[in-house]
From Swiss-Prot:
Keywords in alphabetical order: Chaperone, Cytoplasm, DNA replication, Metal-binding, Repeat, Stress response, Zinc, Zinc-finger
Species for this entry: Listeria monocytogenes serovar 1/2a (strain ATCC BAA-679 / EGD-e)
Biological role: Participates actively in the response to hyperosmotic and heat shock by preventing the aggregation of stress-denatured proteins and by disaggregating proteins, also in an autonomous, DnaK-independent fashion. Unfolded proteins bind initially to DnaJ; upon interaction with the DnaJ-bound protein, DnaK hydrolyzes its bound ATP, resulting in the formation of a stable complex. GrpE releases ADP from DnaK; ATP binding to DnaK triggers the release of the substrate protein, thus completing the reaction cycle.
PANTHER family recorded: CHAPERONE PROTEIN DNAJ, DNAJ HOMOLOG 1, MITOCHONDRIAL-RELATED
Gene: dnaJ
Superkingdom of origin: Bacteria
Cofactor(s), names only, from the UniProt record: Zn(2+)
Protein's recorded name: Chaperone protein DnaJ
Alphabetical GO biological process terms: chaperone cofactor-dependent protein refolding; DNA replication; protein refolding; response to heat
Zinc finger (CR-type): 134-216
Co-factor binding comment: Binds 2 Zn(2+) ions per monomer.
A Gene Ontology molecular function term of the record: heat shock protein binding
Amino acid sequence: MAKRDYYEVLGISKSASADEIKKAYRKLSKQYHPDINKEAGADEKFKEISEAYEALSDPQKRAQYDQYGHVDPNQGFGGGGAGGGFGGGGFSGFEDIFDTFFGGGGRQQDPNAPRQGSDLQYTMRLKFKEAIFGKDAEIEIPREENCDTCHGSGAKPGTTPEKCSHCGGKGSINVEQNTPFGRVVNKRTCQYCNGTGKEIKEKCPTCHGKGRVTKTKKIKVKVPAGVNDGQQMRVSGEGEAGINGGPNGDLYVVFVVIPDEFFEREADDIYVEVPITFVQATLGDEIDVPTVHGKVRLKIPSGTQTGTTFRLRGKGVPHLRGNGTGDQHVIVKVIVPKKLDDKQKEILREFASTTGDKVDEQTSGFFDKMKRAFKGD
């Protein structure tokens, strides 16, 4: 069955803008999404809409579609005939074709050139205070290393890899292909040696010709003081082994910090909420406040309101790059007693009568604003 025109599928003109394409796709995708539309054929319709949007939303793909329609110019025309040798797939796009015409095919990397090993990632969980003060840790990671038996060659000891007879040691082969521009030659990775340019007749009994084995490596890591959740640290040269004598890759340690039940962290500052009694808030007091650095005495002035914040300078998180420490912010929460005996109630009534039981000007202003909000003023 022939494919419908992509513009027709989305119900737009060929001169439609990118915004018009996106708007049409959103409307149709909501209408035919399988989770919403249970009608027969809705699923296929949704796939057709998605395919059309994928082609028309990308400027390069759209230009290609406008010129060739549903015919893929990368597939050639007419095939290769017997013995044509057209294995290895089509072109990756116009870039490959122009590379072949203008010498870009020479970009093929030397298969025997040294290459850096792959990078690795390790997730380390830290307690709240471990992230603040740092720690020395030892981790174990599985990684690819050169085989000790064959020293990375992949060949049985006493033998050496031979030059690939299919690519002549180049690691690539030339493939002829028909294109809209004519018959061209393109380079492809040799499928017989996987681009290494070598053939191993007798494989190493340890690594079975791979030249590499997986080992578990213990690595000592120094976690710096002040790291935060989601940050990562690079450990140079502790990734996988390089290829053809190339350098090792790097290891990236990603930190996941376990939240604390009392302390909260924002950047290099720490926030805590401390309860005080009604009497302490009214008359003032000195209280002990826990910090990550130890206990600190904090003076509570008389008349302190709930939500008042006090700053303890230098009691936060050490700056990761050095030069200073953050602060700790203490947020006071005044606790009102829930149960009072008769004597306590009488004392409070007497207190209320002497003060007129009125809120202060600041609080009164708040209630005035609230009344206006209810009235819609």
